[in-house]
Amino acid sequence: GDSLYGSHSPTVTSQLGSLCMAPALLMASYQPGVKIEERPLNRMQQTGVKPSLGEDKPKVPGILPFSVEALMADRKPGRDRDLSSPTGSPLAGTSHSPRVGSIAAGETPNSPISLGNRYPVGAIMQLPEETLLKPESPERSSWIQSPSFSPSPTRRMSPPACPLRKHKTNRKPRTPFTTSQLLALERKFRQKQYLSIAERAEFSSSLNLTETQVKIWFQNRRAKAKRLQEAELEKLKMAAKPMLPPAFGISFPLGTPVPTASLYGTSNPFQRQALPMSPMGLYTAHLGYSMYHLS
């Protein structure tokens, strides 16, 4: 007899091939993100062959996330669908009222609002006013009033403390020296600014003072003498500065006597006009002079 495949016509052979390809095409239709070409299914419909596996399961065409159909239908992929439900436990710190774009309590997941769209324009327009959070509602501004988001209050800049010199509370009172004691101390200081231990003990006993009082007085007197001497030297430096630049000088012809009138600025038709000058002896000073030196 003839073989199984040899006795059939080419039409029957193509029908059997379509039946073999049908399960693979149906399995590919369940893969997410894969769009099925309609050409093999059209061939099956034209030949009249109906797949046995496709009768009990509905056809779910997959849509790519960036395809034209997904953009026109305003959809997102299945993994980004809204997972929030009324029975789900809310996160800690979030409000229990429904937010804009979420599923309301009385709606089902199959409602037009919950088609995987978080913020569709049509769904927001169809929501009742009670589900929307108004700007003045306390639930909307609760996170703003929380201490973690509220800015810290500006600290007032306290005025800087006045740096006043505070004396110690246990400071000893100032020693009131008499006039005779001050004169004796000044006389002794002009003789000798530094006293030995024996001299200080003898001198303090003669003035009815303690050695510490005499020592402190001599220390203060030496500091005062140093300040006065520095002030005198500063005055001498200021007075010694010439009125003219150092490179500028007045020259006279050699062998001719210097007229006295030219030093004081008097006019002479045969001599140059001289600038007024003070006598040279005014600037001479004994820098080594000591004001406490006794002659």
Curated annotation (Swiss-Prot):
Gene Ontology CC: one annotated term: nucleus
Residue spans of biased composition, Basic residues class: 164-174
Keywords on record: Developmental protein, DNA-binding, Homeobox, Nucleus
DNA-binding region: 170-229
Location in the cell: Nucleus
Source organism superkingdom: Eukaryota
PROSITE patterns attached to this UniProt entry: HOMEOBOX_1, HOMEOBOX_2
Compositional bias (Polar residues): 84-97
The UniProt record lists the keyword Nucleus: yes
Keyword Transcription tagged: no
Composition bias type Low complexity, residue spans: 141-153
GO biological process: embryonic morphogenesis; regulation of transcription by RNA polymerase II
Gene3D superfamilies tied to this protein: Homeodomain-like (1.10.10.60)
InterPro entries found in the cross-reference section: HD, HD_metazoa, Homeobox_CS, Homeodomain-like_sf, Msh_Homeobox_Regulators
Family: Belongs to the Msh homeobox family.
Name recorded for this polypeptide: Homeobox protein XHOX-7.1
Species for this entry: Xenopus laevis
